[in-house]
Amino acid sequence: MVKLSCGPILLALVLCISLTSVANAQQCGRQRGGALCGNNLCCSQFGWCGSTPEYCSPSQGCQSQCTGSGPDPGQGGSAQNVRATYHIYNPQNVGWDLNAVSAYCSTWDANKPYAWRSKYGWTAFCGPVGPRGRDSCGKCLRVTNTRTGAQTTVRIVDQCSNGGLDLDINVFQQIDTDGVGNQQGHLIVNYQFVNCGDNVNVPLLSVVDKE
């Protein structure tokens, strides 16, 4: 009688199943053209979806739908596949002065502390989801490049008319990590209203004003 040994065969079968499971795992971010994870899961720096700090913490390289040390979700909603052009505000060249660039929100926010005005990059907002006019001023958005997964947080300081966002050129270039936006003249982005964190008590910063 021939005695069969199933050990090596069983081991190979288990290994094959394990590799197949990994290959079929959902990917996201720049590894998959800026795709977002389903069920609001976080996208890790390596392009995998999950909900633990390794996936969700910005300090761990989280690419999108991040939590942890990032801003908490704010009121205003979110939108996907929105057109984002760029505008040359260059706030760093004008002391982050809203009046100097004739921003719509300067009426209400021009006298805010320098630390507030310079905390985030600037954008004009006219997106399909969220408040408009004065109600949008000063609010923050987490903006994600759908092609690469690169993201940043911006503050609304102005209005626009393109049906999406008009990012400061510096912000635009920051998330245009593959240069396609520069070639096309626009990006396709997702945005989410987030908490700006302006209520954090930072007395040393709050009194600094370069005006």
Swiss-Prot record:
Gene3D superfamilies: Endochitinase-like, RlpA-like domain. GO terms for molecular function: chitin binding; RNA nuclease activity. Keywords: Chitin-binding, Disulfide bond, Signal. Disulfide bonds join C28-C43, C37-C49, C42-C56, C62-C66. InterPro entries: Barwin_CS, Barwin_dom, Chitin-bd_1, Chitin-binding_1_CS, Endochitinase-like_sf, PR4, RlpA-like_sf. Residues 1-25 form the signal peptide. PROSITE patterns: BARWIN_1 (PS00771), BARWIN_2 (PS00772), BARWIN_3 (PS51174), CHIT_BIND_I_1 (PS00026), CHIT_BIND_I_2 (PS50941). Residues 26-68 form the Chitin-binding type-1 domain. It holds the Pfam family Chitin_bind_1. This is Wound-induced protein WIN2. It comes from Solanum tuberosum.
